[in-house]
């Protein structure tokens, strides 16, 4: 059933024009993009069902293959859904370019959507200028963080190449528990000493979870 089969007063397009985009529900906004539902459900009911079963956040995390497993979602609709969330991700990234870091919350917000597979542990380095604005970031390792996987020379070589004044370490804990392990503390200590020698300060080490973070600096561990 298509949008044109819905009563004119209830069509998302007409409601958008009449009341503005803010008046539309998430399902109605999604319906404007997908346009047609399934043989048994109109597009608004289809989108309401999608969001009820998966949530907007859940839909954003699904791969193209996983989206196509949902009844009524073929390749074209799966690509439309994926494209919407990818655009949102890129807009969020664009807003963070050259962002000034004033604390661990800024680091947490900057990293949202930048960790490619949150089921694995990733270590990133943020390179900052003299005003604590982000110059760039690089992925360093994937997998459980240990001192044997960390090569200070490579990290600080990259910092020098970026003309960075300081760096911040960031890594995720897939479990969601942001408390640092002994290995996390050891890695932080090694890189702080290396940074002190090169006069490139390690400003912080931030561990991120699902909706929380741990700052070594805030807990006086740096």
From Swiss-Prot:
The keyword Protease applies. PROSITE patterns: MPN, UPF0758. Residues 100-222 form the MPN domain. Keywords: Hydrolase, Metal-binding, Metalloprotease, Protease, Zinc. InterPro entries: MPN, RadC_JAB, RuvA_2-like, UPF0758, UPF0758_CS, UPF0758_N. Zn(2+) binds at residues 171, 173, 184. One of its GO terms (molecular function) is metal ion binding. NCBIfam families: PRK00024.1 (NF000642), radc (TIGR00608). PANTHER family: DNA REPAIR PROTEIN RADC, UPF0758 PROTEIN YEES-RELATED. Belongs to the UPF0758 family. This is UPF0758 protein Cpar_0627. It comes from Chlorobaculum parvum (strain DSM 263 / NCIMB 8327).
């Amino acid at each position: 059933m298509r949008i044109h089969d819905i009563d004119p007063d209830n069509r998302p397009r007409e409601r958008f024009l009449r009341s503005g985009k803010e008046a539309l529900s998430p399902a109605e906004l999604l319906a404007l993009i997908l346009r047609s539902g399934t043989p048994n459900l109109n597009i608004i009911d289809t989108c309401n069902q999608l969001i009820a079963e998966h949530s907007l956040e859940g839909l954003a995390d699904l791969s193209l293959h996983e989206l196509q497993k949902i009844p009524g979602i073929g390749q074209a609709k799966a690509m439309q859904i994926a494209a919407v969330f990818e655009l949102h991700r890129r807009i969020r990234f664009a807003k963070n370019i050259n962002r000034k870091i004033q604390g661990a919350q800024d680091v947490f917000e900057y990293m949202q959507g930048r960790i490619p597979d949150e089921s694995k542990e990733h270590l990133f380095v943020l390179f900052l200028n003299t005003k604590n604005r982000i110059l760039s970031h690089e992925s360093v390792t994937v997998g459980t963080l240990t001192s044997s996987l960390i090569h200070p020379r490579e990290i600080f070589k990259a910092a020098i190449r970026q003309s960075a004044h300081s760096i911040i370490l960031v890594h995720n804990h897939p479990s969601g528990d942001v408390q640092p392990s002994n290995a996390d503390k050891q890695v932080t200590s090694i890189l702080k000493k290396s940074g002190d020698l090169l006069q490139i300060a390690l400003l912080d080490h931030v561990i991120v979870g699902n909706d929380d973070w741990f700052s070594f600096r805030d807990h006086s561990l740096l």
